[in-house]
């Protein structure tokens, strides 16, 4: 939260209720959060039974930061991120591409569209979309040179990672919070920590201490942190530590084979989007989405989209207030 008298202007950020906010790169995700990501917050992404869908949110997060000139930092001890995720960061769509979608292909197309009766004109239409339709990034085209800092150590350790993060935050005081006006120019730091739940860290038993220090570091800096993990492969007590450290907690649970057959009407949806918790950095009350029955779709064509889950009507069941007549009602005495 900004102190009284503070004046910070960072590209890609806005101030709301004395809180600095930034976009995640996914419009539907921002809408669920109340408009944007809150500065100094930690977002926990639980890839339950999967390791492929959370990368869409991470790539949008990094692409948005690179677009506005934010500093980005990625740490993943299990793989070389320079050869994986950094090679598939999407490019931002041009404004001309969105305008082409709105222009009809033929002059008479707009007149030939179907129209509903006038008495239904003011009836609210049911839609599954959350927030603005479409996506700002093209996942089929990738950035050639992504300026992202990478955590690279032969023996990964939480103590070494925290030391590097402190050096990044304090370098030239670009990401440290300061009171009053003046001082060095500030910038936002976007951090992505992947697979910190794996038992390949040298000081894995110090995960709880690392999370406490990380939370304190985030509160005192202009930074937003993404943590990507898998609760399905973690002990319950270890996962509780991650949940306690996170301000925003979401879970991506893909459909199993039976659910894919059951939910064919959902089209290309890939799984459930569970919203576990929202940030409470300013008050005990927080933004509450109007509905929590959500699904997600992740593809290179549409990117990552969150939709409302609409169940098909049950045609076999009688309508409300109507019941089938029983045989006893036709008996004459």
UniProtKB/Swiss-Prot annotation:
Keywords: Cytoplasm, Nucleus, tRNA processing. One of its GO terms (molecular function) is phosphorylase kinase regulator activity. The lineage of its organism: Eukaryota, Metazoa, Ecdysozoa, Nematoda, Chromadorea. Component of the elongator complex which is required for multiple tRNA modifications, including mcm5U (5-methoxycarbonylmethyl uridine), mcm5s2U (5-methoxycarbonylmethyl-2-thiouridine), and ncm5U (5-carbamoylmethyl uridine). The elongator complex catalyzes the formation of carboxymethyluridine in the wobble base at position 34 in tRNAs. Belongs to the ELP4 family. This is Elongator complex protein 4. Pathway: tRNA modification; 5-methoxycarbonylmethyl-2-thiouridine-tRNA biosynthesis. One of its GO terms (biological process) is regulation of transcription by RNA polymerase II. GO terms for cellular component: cytoplasm; elongator holoenzyme complex; transcription elongation factor complex.
């Amino acid at each position: 939260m900004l102190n009284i008298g503070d004046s910070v202007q960072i590209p890609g950020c806005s101030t709301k209720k004395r809180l600095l906010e930034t976009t995640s790169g996914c419009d539907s995700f921002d809408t669920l959060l109340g408009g944007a990501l809150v500065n100094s917050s930690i977002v926990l992404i639980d890839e339950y039974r999967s390791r492929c869908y959370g990368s869409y949110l991470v790539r949008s997060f990094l692409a948005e930061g690179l677009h506005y000139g934010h500093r980005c930092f990625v740490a993943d001890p299990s793989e070389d991120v320079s050869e994986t995720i950094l090679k598939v960061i999407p490019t931002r769509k041009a404004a001309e591409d969105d305008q082409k979608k709105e222009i009809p292909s033929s002059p008479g197309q707009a007149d030939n569209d179907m129209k509903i009766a006038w008495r239904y004109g003011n009836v609210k239409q049911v839609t599954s979309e959350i927030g603005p339709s479409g996506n700002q990034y093209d996942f089929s085209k990738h950035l050639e040179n992504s300026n992202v800092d990478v955590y690279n150590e032969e023996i990964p350790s939480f103590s070494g990672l925290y030391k590097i993060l402190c050096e990044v935050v304090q370098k030239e005081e670009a990401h440290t919070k300061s009171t009053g006006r003046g001082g060095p120019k500030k910038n936002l730091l976007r951090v992505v920590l992947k697979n910190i739940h794996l038992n390949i860290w040298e000081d894995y038993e110090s995960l709880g201490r690392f999370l406490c220090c990380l939370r304190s570091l985030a509160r005192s800096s202009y930074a937003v942190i993404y943590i990507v993990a898998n609760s399905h492969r973690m002990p319950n007590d270890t996962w509780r530590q991650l949940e306690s450290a996170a301000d925003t907690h979401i879970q991506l649970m893909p459909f199993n084979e039976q659910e894919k057959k059951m939910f064919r009407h959902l089209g290309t949806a890939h799984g459930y989007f569970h919203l576990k918790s929202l940030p409470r950095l300013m008050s005990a009350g927080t933004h509450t989405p109007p509905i929590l029955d959500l699904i997600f779709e992740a593809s290179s064509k549409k990117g990552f989209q969150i939709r409302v889950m609409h169940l098909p009507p049950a045609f076999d069941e009688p309508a409300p207030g109507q019941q089938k007549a029983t045989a006893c009602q036709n008996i004459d005495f």
